[in-house]
Amino acid sequence: MPVYEHLLPVNGAWRQDVTNWLSEDVPSFDFGGYVVGSDLKEANLYCKQDGMLCGVPFAQEVFNQCELQVEWLFKEGSFLEPSKNDSGKIVVAKITGPAKNILLAERTALNILSRSSGIATASHKIISLARSTGYKGTIAGTRKTTPGLRRLEKYSMLVGGCDTHRYDLSSMVMLKDNHIWATGSITNAVKNARAVCGFAVKIEVECLSEDEATEAIEAGADVIMLDNFKGDGLKMCAQSLKNKWNGKKHFLLECSGGLNLDNLEEYLCDDIDIYSTSSIHQGTPVIDFSLKLAH
C-alpha cells in the first residue's frame, strides 16, 4: 500500500495549518479544559460509517501538538466497514494523555478525518467505477476546493485513487472563456501564456466546439478540455480530433462539466485521456467518526 504520508514534507506548511486549526478552535481560554483538568485518560477513536480512512497524518499532527500518544489500528487508505459489527462502529485509534489535551484535540481531529475520509471514499468509488468498465485513463478532481483546505482535500483525492488536477494557478495554465474573450482569440491567449510560462508549464484550453479544439491544438495547447459536451457528441468529437491529429500533434483530451458517479459511465471512452469532476470533493458527504473517553 502506498505511504501517502511521504508526500508531506517534514518542515511543510501543513503543520502550520494544523496549528491554525487548533488556534481557531480555542483562540483564548479553554474553559472545558479547566473543567476536566490534566488527569491521565484513555480514549477510543471510532469510525461509525463505511468508508476509506484518510487524513491520518493530519490528525496525528493534531494529537502531536496536543502532546498525546496515539496508536493507530488501521493504515491510511484502509477501507473500514463498521456496518459489519453489531455495535455499528469500529475502533480506529487509541489515545492516551491528559484529559484536557484529549478534548482539545477531539473536534479538530474528527473534522479532519471526517472530511478527508469523505473525499477519499468518493474518489475511490468513482475511480473503481471507471476501472470496472475497462477505462484506463485518469479521473481527476478540480481546483474548486474549500479555501484553506486545499492541501487536505487534494491529498484526500490521491488517497482515494484519483488525480488532483492542477494544484493552483501556478501549476498549469488553464485558459477558459474569460481569458479567451479578454485576449480576442484562443490563438492569442495560448501565445501570450507560452511567452511567460515557458516549456515547463502545460497549457490547457477550455473548448466548447470541435472548431475551438482545433484552434487550440494548432496554437500549441498541451491539454484540450471538451467542456459540457454530451455523451455521444463528446465521443464523436474526441475520435475526430485524435484521428485528425494522429502523428502530427501531441495533446491530451479532457472531458469536464457535470460529471458524477451517476452519469460518468455514459461519457467514458478511450479517446478521452482525463475526466475531471468536482463531485468527489465539493459537497461530498463526510464519514462519521467519534471519540469517547474510557469510563
Curated annotation (Swiss-Prot):
Pfam families: QRPTase_C, QRPTase_N. Pathway: Cofactor biosynthesis; NAD(+) biosynthesis; nicotinate D-ribonucleotide from quinolinate: step 1/1. It catalyses: nicotinate beta-D-ribonucleotide + CO2 + diphosphate = quinolinate + 5-phospho-alpha-D-ribose 1-diphosphate + 2 H(+). Coiled coil: none annotated. One of its GO terms (molecular function) is nicotinate-nucleotide diphosphorylase (carboxylating) activity. It is an enzyme of class 2 (transferase). One of its GO terms (biological process) is quinolinate catabolic process. GO terms for cellular component: cytoplasm; nucleus. Its EC number is 2.4.2.19. Substrate binds at R107, T142, R143, K144, R166, K176, E206, D227, S256, G257, G258. Transmembrane segments: none annotated. Keywords: Cytoplasm, Glycosyltransferase, Nucleus, Pyridine nucleotide biosynthesis, Transferase. It is found in: Cytoplasm; Nucleus. Belongs to the NadC/ModD family. Involved in the catabolism of quinolinic acid (QA). Present with 2660 molecules/cell in log phase SD medium. Hexamer formed by 3 homodimers. This is Nicotinate-nucleotide pyrophosphorylase [carboxylating]. It comes from Saccharomyces cerevisiae (strain ATCC 204508 / S288c) (Baker's yeast).
